[in-house]
């Protein structure tokens, strides 16, 4: 999963205990939060012992009583014990994002936006190497001029 920063919010889907949820990727949130109106009624929850800061005033704050199995947007295995409160959309916090291997990368300014789009369409993920297992060279190979005119491509 990759998302360019744009006017659209970065949202992705996760499957928690077999149920699909969509949430906002929030690197500023320590913990993941599920909207109270999306929390299944038969899933146990308890009053949270700590409040939530940064989302306004939430009168009812709960936490899952269980640690739940979660599959990330690219089927990354993870676990979460989310907070639950009245918010308009779910938030995927760093508790999940770290397990999913999320990265924030800023492309090298030497590459044009067009070349970055071409690479992204070809399946390149910033910060990952090229190749089947994304384990290839992670930085571009720089072309160097061979002043001695020796080596492949130069007459002896």
Curated annotation (Swiss-Prot):
Domain of life: Eukaryota
PTM per Swiss-Prot/TrEMBL: Autoproteolytically processed at the N-terminus. Expected C-terminal autoprocessing not detected. The sequence shown is that of the processed Pro protein.
One of the GO BP terms on file: proteolysis
Peptidase A2 domain mapped to chain residues: 21-96
CDD domains to which the protein is assigned, alphabetical: HIV_retropepsin_like
SUPFAM superfamilies for the chain: Acid proteases
Gene3D superfamilies per UniProt: Acid Proteases
Keyword Hydrolase assigned: yes
Segments forming domain G-patch: 111-156
EC number: 3.4.23.50
Enzyme class, spelled out: hydrolase
Any one Gene Ontology molecular-function term assigned to this protein's record: nucleic acid binding
Misc: Two human-specific proviruses are inserted as tandem repeats with a shared LTR in most individuals tested. The telomeric copy is referred here as 'provirus 41574'. The centromeric copy is referred here as 'provirus 41575'.
Family: Belongs to the peptidase A2 family. HERV class-II K(HML-2) subfamily.
Assembly mode: Active as a homodimer.
Full protein name: Endogenous retrovirus group K member 6 Pro protein
Organism: Homo sapiens (Human)
Classification lineage: Eukaryota, Metazoa, Chordata, Craniata, Vertebrata
